A protein has these predicted regions:
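Vicinal oxygen chelate
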Residues: 14, 24, 64-68, 74-86, ...
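Hydrophobic faces of well-ordered beta-strands that scaffold small-molecule active sites
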Residues: 4-6, 91
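Residues that flank catalytic or metal-binding motifs in active/ligand-binding sites
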Residues: 56-58, 87-89, 134
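Short beta->alpha transition motifs characteristic of CBS
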Residues: 122, 139-147
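Active-site-proximal beta-strand/loop segments in catalytic clefts of secreted hydrolases
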Residues: 73-75, 141-142
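Core segments of cupin and vicinal oxygen chelate
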Residues: 8-67
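Glycine/serine-rich loop-strand microenvironments at binding/catalytic pocket rims
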Residues: 1-4, 140-142
């Protein structure tokens, strides 16, 4: 079955971030749970992984809402990665109800920054946006008509 998912790189705190998301969305990690860099078999053409990086998250999956899967990894500097957060990507959530929208908005913005409070918009949605405490940007669009 085809699917689209969002893949997030973190600077050594993927497990913390995904445990937070797991508590927000009340779901469990998918696949084989948390895969660690220590799970990578040694390869001839690759230098050995530093001990400090072995427990980092190589891959993790979490179903969030509407069948969407959030995936992530730590991006170790020893492997040439550098994480730079920008303002060009949002994860857009479209909950079924205003109550669910408010619940998710409050949880994800806690410890982060509200960029637009939830409010009724001219296009007919109950809309708001925030950046969570891990630097991930979220938009909320609820089209429930009753308040």
């Amino acid at each position: 079955m085809s699917r689209v998912s969002t893949y997030l790189n973190f600077p050594r705190n993927t497990e913390e971030a995904f445990n937070f998301y797991k508590s927000v969305f009340k779901t469990q990690f998918g696949g084989n749970g948390i895969a660690r860099f220590s799970d990578i078999p040694p390869q001839e053409d690759m230098p050995p992984l530093p001990d400090v990086d072995k427990n980092l998250v190589m891959h993790i999956e979490l179903p969030i809402t509407g069948g969407h899967v959030l995936m992530g990894t730590d991006a170790p500097e020893s492997m040439g990665f550098s994480v730079n957060f920008g303002n060009n990507v949002y994860i857009n959530l479209e909950p079924d109800t205003r109550a669910e929208t408010k619940k998710l908005f409050d949880a994800l913005s806690n410890g982060g920054k509200v960029t637009m409070d939830l409010q009724d918009m001219f296009w007919g949605a109950y809309y708001g946006s925030c950046t969570d405490k891990y630097g991930v940007q979220w938009m909320f669009n609820c089209v429930e008509t009753s308040k």
